[in-house]
Curated annotation (Swiss-Prot):
UniProt organism field: Metallosphaera sedula (strain ATCC 51363 / DSM 5348 / JCM 9185 / NBRC 15509 / TH2)
Pfam families hit by this protein: UPF0147
InterPro entries given in the database record: Ta0600-like_sf (IPR023130), UPF0147 (IPR005354)
Family: Belongs to the UPF0147 family.
Protein name, as recorded: UPF0147 protein Msed_2034
Length: 89
């Protein structure tokens, strides 16, 4: 049961970091939209934490290849992905 709380804490931490990306107007709109989609996936209560993390990681991994992404945003995305990759059921 402790891992469930750990997973939820990691998801909340990832959401906070992604919210910063969404609220940063210097980030291109398509990247902010992908971050919003990832947040929506992370907040979906019908899926297990690992599935939510995997879905969000797929979105973020795809968008992290965008050449228009500012470097500080890319680092934030990578940090979120590394947090989400530690989530297991």
């Amino acid at each position: 049961m402790a891992t469930l709380y750990d997973n939820e804490a990691k998801i909340k931490q990832a959401i906070v970091l992604l919210q910063k990306v969404v609220n940063d107007t210097s980030v291109p709109r398509n990247i902010r939209r992908a971050a919003s989609d990832a947040i929506r996936n992370l907040q979906d209560p019908s899926l297990s934490p690992a599935v939510r993390a995997a879905n969000a990681t797929a979105i973020l991994d795809e968008i992290s290849q965008d050449p228009n992404m500012p470097s500080q945003t890319r680092i934030s995305i990578w940090n979120v992905v590394s947090i989400l990759e530690t989530i297991r059921d």
